[in-house]
Design a protein with these regions (language model features):
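Alpha-helical scaffold domains
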Residues: 1-181
Length: 181
């Protein structure tokens, strides 16, 4: 797989991701070092990030959840693709209702991130989590909607019922208007 990543060709990196995923039942804890090296070394766009993280690293985390702490560390790195990786790694587990406290913690770490690719990544993670935990995700969004970037908010509520979407998207009246001024 390393040679495929080193080629710099996107199609070859996708083959590396697919091949690694086909072996996910054989992962051992020490494989995290290789996966993390790929994240830090080779991710340079959303496609390579999402292809590696959604299935391959997501499957690894499902087998070895002790590495959730590493994802929280990734969420604090200067590299935008590593920050996005911290969220999109949890898309499939989130859909399955797993790791909600960790998902919310990562979303909080990334909450004020100014990078739109990171906002879309953690918004997508929240949207996936809402499939199993709609009320919890709605409450999370509502508690943070005044500061949450609209891009992330829109992604997070995309699959919610219309009435919840409308509540989440409603802008708070300015204080002056509320005070009658």
């Amino acid at each position: 797989c390393e040679g495929l990543w080193q080629s710099g060709c996107m199609e070859e990196s996708f083959i590396a991701c697919q091949w690694a995923y086909t072996r996910h039942k054989e992962f051992v804890p020490d494989d995290f070092a290789t996966l993390e090296r790929w994240v830090h070394t080779y991710l340079s766009n959303w496609a390579s990030c999402d292809t590696l993280c959604n299935h391959t690293i997501g499957a690894f985390i499902q087998s070895y959840p002790e590495h959730l702490a590493d994802l929280k560390r990734w969420a604090r790195t200067p590299n935008r693709w590593v920050r996005r990786a911290s969220a999109v790694t949890l898309i499939i587990p989130a859909r399955q209702g797993q790791f909600l406290p960790d998902i919310l913690e990562i979303a909080d770490i990334l909450l004020m991130d100014e990078d739109d690719m990171v906002q879309k990544g953690y918004g997508w993670m929240l949207k996936a989590a809402s499939q199993a935990h709609q009320q919890e995700i709605f409450e999370f969004v509502m508690a943070r909607k005044a500061v949450m970037p609209r891009t992330a908010l829109r992604y997070a509520i995309e699959k919610m019922p219309k009435e919840l979407k409308e509540k989440a998207m409603a802008r708070e009246p300015e204080r002056r208007k509320r005070a009658g001024k």
